Amino acid sequence: MSEADGLRQRRPLRPQVVTDDGQVPEVKEGSSFSGRVFRMTFLMLAVSLAIPLLGAMMLLESPIDPQSFSFKEPPFMFGVLHPNTKLRQAERLFENQLSGPESIVNIGDVLFTGTADGRVVKLENGEIETIARFGSGPCKTRDDEPTCGRPLGIRAGPNGTLFVVDAYKGLFEVNPQKRSVKLLLSSETPIEGKKMSFVNDLTVTRDGRKIYFTDSSSKWQRRDYLLLVMEATDDGRLLEYDTVTKEVKVLLDQLQFPNGVQLSPEEDFVLVAETTMARIRRVYVSGLMKGGADMFVENMPGFPDNIRPSSSGGYWVAAATIRANPGFSMLDFLSDKPFIKRMIFKMFSQETVMKFVPRYSLVLEVSDSGAFRRSLHDPDGQVVTYVSEAHEHDGYLYLGSFRSPFICRLSLQSI
């Protein structure tokens, strides 16, 4: 062995380095150990933060006391319920000039609606004219609603007047020619010991004597409608008001968000949408079955809002939220999970939760026996959003909305 060879053998080892060919460094075990320490430290920190946060959430008061219930499996969306895009053929009218035109009625070719800023307006020849207001301003935020007022259901009476319910103020008669307003029944008036907190929709006999209307809850106001749905409160009622005697009767109570109402053509029964339960009840108001009630449509593919007559002898039913099958329905999923619903509303506002509700608009035509005749869809709300009513007039459907800044018009001939 040469001296040079010996020197090379005694040369100290150098640390191995990572090269482009992917050699593993000699410090692998040390690096893995450091990574495990970091992950363990992070996990312990996360747990130490999560436990007091969870404890604080448990101490927070939930705005709702949800009731547990369950739905049947939603109907499969095939046949007449098969998804389509027919509602996208509608045109928007008065876009960004109206706010939440929930319900629509016509006298001749003149349309009337109520808006989120507390007005009842006339729509004629492309112009908007205010004809009534039941409250006073300001009308900018949800906190203003009780003083501002919120006109919802609107109907035409036999003498050229309008009957309107305001969610906060009560039942009114409006003369659109004179711009006069007459209070028929104040929401401050207790009915059988209960106040009316959310007056919603109405239907009127042809002679104008009887008015059937819904009070959706004696606990929740309109501005808290999502809390009403999520809590599944069963304190809603269907009521009858006699314009001659001024008497008020409770026809049906313990309803879960009673919403839209519609008299039958023979005026022997009233249909009432029970939104939370995705069904429509039938209440008999004359004839041999007077005083009785039964189910008209059960287990609907959407949560029904207003009901209006169709020219075929059936009814148009609007639904702003569907129960997709196949698919996922958040309301179905949460129905028997009150703990989760409490936690959701401890953490998030109604407006935040609404952002997670699909903007799927659905209009159903139902026969006089309660069978589905056809369905009109806008699966992602491209044109029609937050639909609340389908009002048929002169070959068109006029579509109201409880949130959108427009109404829509759909030609029935085009579908």
Swiss-Prot record:
Keywords: Acetylation, Glycoprotein, Membrane, Phosphoprotein, Signal-anchor, Transmembrane, Transmembrane helix
Modified-residue entries (Phosphothreonine), positions: T19
Cytoplasmic side: 2-39
Membrane topology, from the record: Single-pass type II membrane protein
Cell compartments where the protein resides: Membrane
Main location: membrane
Keyword flag Acetylation: yes
Extracellular side: 61-415
Signal sequence extent: none
Glycosylation sites (chain numbering): N159
Residue ranges, annotated region (Disordered): 1-29
Modification N-acetylserine occurs at: S2
Tissue-level expression: Strongly expressed in adipose tissue. Highly expressed in liver, heart, and kidney. Expressed at intermediate level in brain and lung. Weakly expressed in spleen, skeletal muscle and testis.
A Pfam family annotated for this UniProt entry: SSL_N
GO molecular function terms listed in the Swiss-Prot or TrEMBL record: arylesterase activity
Modified how: Glycosylated in vitro.
Residues spanning the membrane: 40-60
A GO-annotated cellular component: cell surface
Protein family per UniProt: Belongs to the strictosidine synthase family.
Function per UniProt: Exhibits strong arylesterase activity with beta-naphthyl acetate and phenyl acetate. May play a role in adipocyte differentiation.
Name under which the protein is recorded: Adipocyte plasma membrane-associated protein
Species for this entry: Mus musculus (Mouse)
